[in-house]
Amino acid sequence: TTDRRWIHYINADGTRGKMRQFDHLPQGAKYQLFDDIRYTNHVGIDFYHRYKEDIALFAELGFTTFNTTISWARIYPHGVEGGVNQEGVEFYRNVFKECRKYGIDPVITLYKYDEPVYLEETYGDWTNREMIHQFVEFARVCFTEYKDLVDKWLTFNEINILLHFDVKEGKQFAFEELHNQMVAAAKAVKVAHEIDKNISVGCMIAGFCSYPYTCDPKDVIANYKEFQNKFAYCADTMVRGYYPSYAKRIWKENNVTLNISEEDKKDLMEGKSDFLAYSYYMSNVVTTHKDEGEALGGAGTSANLKNPYLTASDWGWQIDPTGYEYFLHVLNDRYQVPIFDVENGLGAYDKVEEDGSIH
C-alpha cells in the first residue's frame, strides 16, 4: 500500500478501524478496499477490544437484538484459495457467545461494501462471476461455524444502493455487479438451508419512501416508477425469486443489457429470501415539474425540493415518522414475508454534559 491508502477493517459492530501498518491488523485479517475519503483516521469505539463491556452496556439498555457485520477479510484474507483464518472465526464466535450470554439475538450481515483487497487484486470487481463463488464459500463457512449461535442472517447490506447514485463506471457496470450479487445472495440462501433448515436468510434493501410532490397524475406515476427503480427492483427479485416485468423498462432506460442464464434464473427462484430487511431514515418527494426544483432526469427525487409538512435534521434529512408507518404498510402488502427494520436513526449535534449525559 502507499501513503494515499489507509488499511481499513470493519469492527464487529460495523464501525471501521483504520491504520497504516499491516502488522497492526487484528486477528491476521488483510486490509479491506476503501479509498482514503474519510475525514479522520480515528478509531470509532474500538469494539474489537471492548466488545464484552459494550455488549454488557447494550444488554443494560434492554436491547434483545444486535445487528453487526462479519468482516469477509477476517475470515478469508486471501480468498478461498488462501484458506480460513481460524483466529477470525474464533473472534466472532466469542462475540456471538457474549450476545447469547445476555439473551441477545444476533442478526448478522455478511457483506457491507467490503471485500478483501486480495479478491480485488486477483479477480477485479463484482462483474467477475468468480466473486459469486468466493462469496458463497465465505457464507458457507459462516453458516457452518455459527449455526449454533446465529439463526438470522443478511446477505448484502443495502444491495440496491448502486441504483441510488451514478457510478463512474456507468450503469452497465452497476447493473452487472448488482445481478451477480443477487445471484450470490440466492446461492447463499440455498447453502444455508442445506446446512440447517432452521437458518433464516434475508435480503437488506435501502429504504426508499417517497411521495408525489403534487397531485399531478404525472407526478404520481413518476413517484411509483422511482419506487420500482430504487427499491422494488431488488426486493421483488430477491423475495419473489425472479426479475419483475418492469425490469425491462429499467434496463431500456439505462441502456443496459444483462446476460441472465437459465442457471441464474433457477438460483434466484430456489434461493428466495426468507425475510425482507430494510433501512429507513427519511422520506423524499418526486416531481416531473422542473420549475419546482431540480428533478433528476425529468422525474425523480429532487435535491432542492423539501416536503413542506416535515421538519429536517441538521443535515437536511426530513424527519417523517408517519412515513415509517406508511412504508411498513407498503412492504407488508407487497411481500407478505417477515419484515425487519435493521437501520433507523437521526443525526444530531450532541453535547456531552459534565455528568456524562448526552443531549
Where are these regions (language model features)?
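Active-site region of glycoside hydrolase catalytic domains
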Residues: 1-35, 78-80, 89-358
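Active-site mouth loops of central-metabolism enzymes
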Residues: 36-50, 125-130
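Catalytic domains of carbohydrate-active enzymes, especially glycoside hydrolases
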Residues: 46, 50-71, 270-276
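Aromatic-lined carbohydrate-binding/catalytic grooves of carbohydrate-active enzymes
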Residues: 61-88, 108
